[in-house]
Amino acid sequence: MKTIKVTQTKSSSHRLKNHKLCLQGLGLRRIGHTVEVQDTPSNRGMINKVYYMVSVEE
């Protein structure tokens, strides 16, 4: 299955609880942390919810 590289670019402090949970679900822990996740609808939904805190490479 296709994978996507997701990097956290902004801090998660003072953010909505659901947005923090999305970052946790993607496996992101700190600014500059990069993970590879599978390209699934659920992961895409989490990325779309926190688009302003992450950068995405396909």
UniProtKB/Swiss-Prot annotation:
Name of the gene encoding the protein in the UniProt record: rpmD
Entry's Gene Ontology molecular function annotations: structural constituent of ribosome
Domain of life the protein comes from: Bacteria
Family stated for the protein in its record: Belongs to the universal ribosomal protein uL30 family.
Protein name: Large ribosomal subunit protein uL30
Keyword Ribonucleoprotein: yes
Subunit description: Part of the 50S ribosomal subunit.
SUPFAM superfamilies documented for this protein: Ribosomal protein L30p/L7e
Organism, as annotated: Acinetobacter baumannii (strain AB0057)
Keyword Transmembrane helix: no
